[in-house]
Structure formats: structure tokens, C-alpha cells
Amino acid sequence: MNLPPVYLIDASVYIFRAWFSVPDDFTNARGEPTNAAYGFCGFLCSMLEQTSAQHVAVAFDESLTTSYRNEIYPEYKANRDPAPEDLKRQFQWARSIAECLGLRCFADPRFEADDLIGTLAEHWRARGHPVCVVSSDKDLAQLVRPGDHWWDFSRNEKLGTAQIVQKFGVAPEQIADYLALAGDAVDNIPGIPGVGPKSASALLQHFGDMDSIFNRLEEVQHLSIRGAKSLQQKLRTHRAAAELARRLTVIQTNVASALAKPEIHRNVVDTAGLNRLFDQLQFGGMLRQRCLRV
């Protein structure tokens, strides 16, 4: 018996995308922008209309500066400007919209949305459900296993394990090592100086994982990689930095708050709550009707 897929949504990606793409003249009666919440609501409706999904989790970030990763490496994501107040309040509205649509929401002050998604993916996959991670964040592709998908909904790009190898040059289970070696500018993870995406991919294709690279470091100079001899020295010099980076790039799969209540079966739409919220946000009738139908 084939069990239905579970859809695990990385909320921040789609809230930020709406913030930048939906005109900021969407406001409520107090003149507060509602564009990000409006666009996020439209995204949720579109996703539910396309999939008729009944097992959905929406993961939010509450840990931009309080994540355990910040304790390990204080510069983690330090390159990001704080969200403006006009956007911050919309995150709560976005969560309220998702809850009114009957979707289970998750957030944790010490763990990122990635870790909550990773935990739920592991939990539901172990119970026979295929997993669909809904995000454009390449980090989350590391969670995909045979039968699963990473879905960049806005670009309609849905990738399985083979397609992830084609797109990123490494297998899903190698992505954390790949980012530790090559760095991830988006999250302010420096990687090893002089090791770019091509070198990181070539090393992992040959050795399989980062531990094997360092355990067999003397072999690196003999590889048909440009600058192999100097690459070997860079790896030796910056090994500790790479191992620290991997502690940042690996997505956790055992977050207690998510495992305490992992049920994600969709509830019925809270019509009264949705109407109150839409009245507050002054959303139009067309979006309201879509929400009531999905």
C-alpha cells in the first residue's frame, strides 16, 4: 500500500519572496503592509490546489540569532540584516493564515526551520511516507532520499535524488560536506579558502565524504584536479575550519519539540478564524474564496 506524501514547507523562503514581489501598497486599515502575508497566503492556496495535500507541515524560523549554530559560530548568518518591523509582524500573520487553513505549524527558538523539516522528514519517512520538501534552499536538498523530492514551488522545479546530483554535482547525502568545503555565502559559512564548488564536488565524487578526504589526504595531490598539490595543503591547513563548518551545514533530524507532537494531518479550514483574520488584514474576496475552497 502506497502511503500519501508529506509536504514540509520552508515558510521563510516564500514569505521573503512575497515581501519582495508583491507591491507594498497592500495594507490594512492601520496602514501596515500586508503584502508578504498576502503573497504567502496565495502560495499556500496554489500549493494545496495543485496537490490536494492532506499531510502538511509549515516550518518557521524563530532562531535567527538564538540558534545553537550561533553558539558554535557567532558569525553564522551575521551577514544578514534584521527583518524590518513591517515584515516581522507579517510572519505572525502568515503563521495564523496557515493555521486557519488547517496546517500544522512548527517553530523552535534553538533550531531552524531546516532542522524541524529534517526531523519531520525522518519521522514520516520511517513510517512509510514519501517526503516532499517545499523550498528553494539548496541546504534542504540533503534530506532527499529515494522516493522523496525537493520542490522549488515558485520555479516549478521538483527534483529527486538523480536530479539533485545533476543540479548540484553531488548526491543529497553529500551536500552538507559540500557546503562545509566550498562554503555557503548565504549563511556566512566561509568554507576552505581556495576550494570552490568544482573542487568540492570533485573531491566528494572521488572520496565519498569529507571524513574520507581527510583520512586519505595524501591521495589528493594525485587527483586530476587543477592545483591538486596546493589543494592538499589547503585541506590540511584548514581541516578544523571545515569540520566546524560541517557542524553548521548538517541538518538535525531529532529536534525534541517537533517529535513531541509530530502529527501533520491537515485539519478543516477554520472559516470563522479565517474571516476574522482577513477582515483585519483587509484581504479581498477572491483570495478569501480560494482559501475556503482548498
Regions found by a protein language model. Give the residues of each.
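Non-catalytic nucleic-acid-binding/docking modules located in mid-to-C-terminal regions
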Residues: 2-3, 53-57, 147, 160-294
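Noncatalytic, basic helical substrate-engagement surface that gates or grips nucleic-acid strands
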Residues: 2-134, 138-149, 153-158, 241-244, ...
